[in-house]
């Protein structure tokens, strides 16, 4: 039987067994990957929707829009984190580095920290878009009636609004509702009368030149 090679029944069975094991392993790997992706996306969506709704309720974006932006951003970010974990797992021969990273990511995800960090820029864009739309409508209204009367504050009125310097003894360190950035110790912010909502000077001054009201609660100044 020169030039002819025949496989024994045992060799054929071994090859079939190996192929079966490979197929099952690939199927299980894809199944676990899909389950983990779904888990990350679900947690990110829920936390994102909750965080976005809370931020939206405190800003002009609104509860519904905030929840929608938060849910989408949270889901996308969570999936990106999971995919990064897979790449790290493939690049790390021992897998220990990826395991530690994954544990930290899951803990941060469940606590909501990662999602909140991602929601901030997304909600900032939504708030700025909303404020831009309001300013555009106001400008269109002014053009239609051809009036030069501004509904915003004058420079003198704006300068009379009190400024507050953030210190270590401040009762509560909050964030600016326009840019969503936390106030830092030593910063000077503007505190609106009546409602006492505080904003960064560049953030609120631009708004007040157009509107004589608080952008958060709409209380007239």
From Swiss-Prot:
Residue ranges annotated as transmembrane are 35-55, 69-89, 95-115
Per the record, the zinc finger regions (RING-type) lie at: 176-218
Query: Where does the UniProt annotation locate this protein?
Result: Membrane
Q: Name the InterPro entries for this protein.
A: Gly-zipper_YMGG, Znf_RING, Znf_RING/FYVE/PHD
Q: What induces it?
A: Up-regulated by chitin.
**The keyword Cytoplasm is assigned to this record:** no
Q: Which residues form the signal peptide?
A: none
Q: Name one GO molecular function term.
A: zinc ion binding
Q: Which GO terms describe its cellular component?
A: membrane
Q: Would you kindly state one Gene Ontology biological process term found in this protein's UniProt entry?
A: defense response
Mind telling me which SMART domains this protein's record contains? RING
How does the protein's chain sit in the membrane according to the entry?
Multi-pass membrane protein
Which key words tag this protein in UniProt? Answer: Membrane, Metal-binding, Plant defense, Transmembrane, Transmembrane helix, Zinc, Zinc-finger
Coiled coil ranges (UniProt) are none
Name the family: Belongs to the RING-type zinc finger family. NIP subfamily.
What function is annotated for this protein?
May be involved in the early steps of the plant defense signaling pathway.
For this entry, the protein name equals NEP1-interacting protein-like 1
